[in-house]
């Protein structure tokens, strides 16, 4: 059966697949449009399953502010090229809209968009993963995106400009906690044990070593907390000192960066080429 251009066009519009893939699918089903769509969906699911093992450590961070809250979303792909693709970004924004509208869990988002994800994997040829969604509440909040890769939302009792600048600071300085006293006891204990061992190995007298550890611990908790860090806008002040002068306060923040915590595969191209040359000599 001859396949018409109109049939190919219709299938392409309904599936988003390439023209040649649509023509092939229609030829295999003798022009049965619905069967072609079913077969393409099955093929897409198979491709997605094969791609599932590929490391998706690139992607985008998106933010949307709601009434008294904000949502941050990370969607991953494998390359920065696809991270800029309109189809990928359209999918990510669709997920973001649903998250912002209903504050659903990550598991529910994944389930709701699985069919669309599978279709996108089949279309672009890369693994796609809806990795993280975070919600943060606050009557006053400000958000900041650094490119497509870092997203921050800060909440607190301050004007919008101040919160915006603090969000930029969080993006650059990567604090883990709001205040030094917020650092968990187990984190403090682990660092303290390490500093005691370092001081002992340095051969310092016990009283001096004790003072050194106290100073180092103060520095440690300050460096990983927002209010203890030097403020990037006014480096001679800590963020805490700046907030005190402004009569302002930060209550919470969330910072997401694309791919953080994902173990990336390191490609050794020299070794790969050498192996290919060796294999060709044996052939």
Curated annotation (Swiss-Prot):
This is Elongation factor Ts. Gene3D superfamilies: 1.10.286.20, DNA helicase RuvA subunit, C-terminal domain, Elongation factor Ts, dimerisation domain. The keyword Cytoplasm applies. Its main location: cytoplasm. Disulfide bonds: none annotated. One of its GO terms (cellular component) is cytoplasm. Belongs to the EF-Ts family. It comes from Shewanella oneidensis (strain ATCC 700550 / JCM 31522 / CIP 106686 / LMG 19005 / NCIMB 14063 / MR-1). It is found in: Cytoplasm. The gene is tsf. It comes from the Bacteria. One of its GO terms (molecular function) is translation elongation factor activity.
